[in-house]
Amino acid sequence: MSRRGLLASARALVLILALVASAPRVAAAAEGQITFALNITLAPTWFDPAETPGVITPFLTLYALHDGLVKPMPGNAWAPSLAESWTMSKDGLVYEFVLRRGVRFHNGDVLTAEDVKFSFERYRGGGAASFKARVAAVEIVDAQRIRFRLKQPWPDFMTFYASPATSAAWIVPKKYVERVGDDGFKKAPIGAGPYRFVSFTPGIELVVEAFDGYWRTPPSVKRLVFKSVPDDSTRLVMLKRGETDIAAGFRGPNAEDVRRTPGLTLRVTLPTVSQWVVFTEQWDPKSPWADRRVRLAANLAIDRKAFSDAEFLGHGRPASSIIPRDFEFYWTPPEYPYDPGRARQLLAEAGYPKGFDAGELATDVTFAPESEAVINGLRGVGIRARLRPLERASFYKADQDKQFKNLVRVGSGAAGNAATRIEAFVISGGIRSYGGYPEIDALFRDQAVEMDRKRREALLHRIQQLMYERAMFAPIVEQAVLTGVGPRVAETPTITGHPFISPYEDLRLKAR
């Protein structure tokens, strides 16, 4: 072949290789199934982003069915998702989001700024009051751009809007929701997430299938089945028999059994999940809990380290605050020692030398071990309480409606910072707050508009100091999440601070 021919052939080969390299990759068709055995019972309210009550649990299903403008992902706490970018004006009053083009919901509807505005305006979960108080207007610039105009600078707008502190930025299809209504949407949710809804059998299972049109990457696993199996021992047996691939929420001996079983893997994560006891009657002058000495006695009656070591195999962290220590603006309080002798002395000083009947301690049944540890500690110093376990969705509803008396075991893994946790659980009128104190409320209002970081941090630290000084709560533990993974699963993706295995589109099965 001539030199000219060789050069022509070489150029042709380079062109072909360039075309191949630039051509869109066709993802392999999704196949196989992964079954989850959950330690909770799923509720339809968690299929709708509008109703997330300041806790992390609903994101278990939201990450499958839906998508947000911005959300935590592996290696990025604020990953651009349905929004490919956003900007803030110099005066801090306007946030503008540019939507990703070509995104479709599971029913084929194209996602536009109208859906974003609609989703925000129907949002009624945790943080909704803050949005209503601080957002002046939501403006549709065009189909791909939406603008949030604030009444005054709000340093936490993105923390509230773009993290799992709330789910206000998770988008639903406006036309579909208007057609089927809120109840119809819960029965047959349509989202823009990596998996589409197939079926839900209350108390039994949720089934979802891969959505090939997902913008980020089509899932590799075709079907996910989330089974509700609240009993720890049953989940362990299922995992050992291969009846489930991933079993969540193990504790103590069962977690140790998973760790020692060949072929199984014990996955340990440290999410921002803290647990504590609420003294709902501390604002009632007729209640023993109105006396700070009684609340402090309850704190000294709990052996946090012994519980954490036993239940979480040493991975949990005893807590002295309801705010996780990894949160921005966290103030480090002194640790509560385990001191039952001092607790009895405080009770005697408060007029209860023989203790008192404290009524019920309400709890999500999933966290009965924590609640039993608290009750045993309280009984040891003369505070007699009875356990009242409820299924999780019922517990959340009753707690949000402030229906409980006496004591409540509360927990939250919602992301955010110290301000988002305080907004939901501490200030007067918080979505899950049973009362508040004027001094704390005033400090919270001040910090919400303080743009100087150091001054804002000082305000939030002062709030936390007052919470500690008044013994408003009895913190228990920052829990570890111990998950059993079976031999068929190749990859279990992790999002920092997130208790669940996600994003689901990154799950992989081992090659057969």
Residue ranges of model-derived segments:
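Detector for C-terminal structural segments
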Residues: 31-38, 201, 270, 274-275, ...
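N-terminal lobe/hinge region of extracytoplasmic solute-binding protein
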Residues: 37-90, 121, 190-191
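A structural "hinge/loop" feature
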Residues: 41-59, 82-83, 109, 157-167, ...
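Gly/Pro-rich hinge or "lid" segments in bacterial periplasmic/extracellular proteins
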Residues: 63, 73-77, 164-219, 223, ...
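Aromatic- and charge-enriched surface segment that lines or borders ligand/interaction sites
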Residues: 84-127, 141, 147-149, 235-238, ...
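Surface-exposed binding/hinge segments that line
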Residues: 98, 130-176
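Ligand-site clamp/hinge motif
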Residues: 100, 122, 183, 211-257, ...
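Structural transition elements
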Residues: 195, 285, 292, 313, ...
